[in-house]
Curated annotation (Swiss-Prot):
One of its GO terms (molecular function) is 1-(5-phosphoribosyl)-5-[(5-phosphoribosylamino)methylideneamino]imidazole-4-carboxamide isomerase activity. Coiled coil: none annotated. PANTHER family: 1-(5-PHOSPHORIBOSYL)-5-[(5-PHOSPHORIBOSYLAMINO)METHYLIDENEAMINO] IMIDAZOLE-4-CARBOXAMIDE ISOMERASE. It holds the Pfam family His_biosynth. This is 1-(5-phosphoribosyl)-5-[(5-phosphoribosylamino)methylideneamino] imidazole-4-carboxamide isomerase. Keywords: Amino-acid biosynthesis, Cytoplasm, Histidine biosynthesis, Isomerase. One of its GO terms (cellular component) is cytoplasm. The keyword Cytoplasm applies. It is found in: Cytoplasm. Transmembrane segments: none annotated. It is an enzyme of class 5 (isomerase).
């Protein structure tokens, strides 16, 4: 059954909601939907108190380590953390995080996927402590390709059945941001959600999939549940009232999870 999963997006040490496609090294082009008056620990405790499991803390760029650690310290062993994770710092973050989320370190600067790095990380941390972030963009020929470097660089890794089958040997969970619709609150990428189910349904082990991007209504939980046969979980961001949104109530998301536990 599809569940609601929470997020804490950090930019320059603050909890923010950002239009994903505008996130670049130069902040002049950044479009921000929301900057919270609350510290990261507030959201960590909120998710913990409501038992919203599998929530992730994402460090978007530099100057976020202290803020991320504040969130993790407020809910030790409960939250996942991503952003700048590599083989040298992974175990340090896992002292307080339930799982690490890894993306850019698995690729060369040009965007070539390095399977040996995932194998190394899996051996070091265990596949059950790793989330592989396969956040992606749709190409003109309707393929879904993993994007890195704040979702600005398209990599050589295409999302398909073969990719998920191979990577699932080294991880139990995938996080997929649909970068083209992230932060727009104009609806989820239904094609992608359907594909995520089709690509992973025959994997011979239990794999968790979390989708983020564009969710704008509480009914999107039901939609994702239908499209994915209950195998894909859903994250809300800018549409959620706890992030300044007016479209979705956090309490309704909590009630959905309780009802479908």
């Amino acid at each position: 059954m599809t569940k609601f999963v929470g997020c804490i997006d950090l930019h320059d040490g603050q909890v923010k909601q950002i239009v994903g496609g505008t996130l670049k090294d130069n902040d002049d082009s950044l479009e921000t939907n929301f900057v919270s008056k609350y510290p990261p620990s507030y959201y960590a405790q909120l998710y913990l108190e409501n038992r919203i499991e599998g929530c992730h803390v994402i460090k978007l760029g530099p100057n976020n380590d202290a803020a991320a650690m504040e969130a993790l310290n407020a809910a030790p062993g409960f939250l996942q953390v991503g952003g700048g994770i590599n083989d040298e710092n992974c175990l340090q973050w896992l002292e307080k995080a339930s799982k690490i989320i890894v993306t850019s370190w698995l690729f060369t600067k040009e965007g070539t996927f390095l399977m040996d790095r995932l194998q190394l990380l899996s051996n070091k941390c265990g596949p059950d402590r790793i989330v592989v972030d396969l956040s992606c963009r749709r190409t003109p020929d309707s393929k879904w390709v993993v994007a890195m470097n704040k979702w600005q660089t398209l990599t050589t890794l295409e999302l398909n059945k073969e990719t998920f089958t191979e990577l699932s040997k080294y991880t139990d969970e995938f996080l997929i941001h649909a970068a083209d619709v992230e932060g727009l609150c104009k609806g989820i990428e239904t094609d992608l959600v359907t594909k995520l189910y089709e690509w992973t349904k025959d994997i011979n082990k239990e794999v968790k999939i979390v989708y983020a991007g564009g969710a704008k209504s509480i009914s999107d939980l039901e939609l994702v549940d239908k499209l994915s046969n209950g195998t894909v979980d859903l994250t809300y961001g800018s549409s959620l009232d706890i992030f300044g949104g007016k479209l979705v109530r956090f309490q309704d998301c909590c009630e959905w999870n309780s009802k479908h536990n």
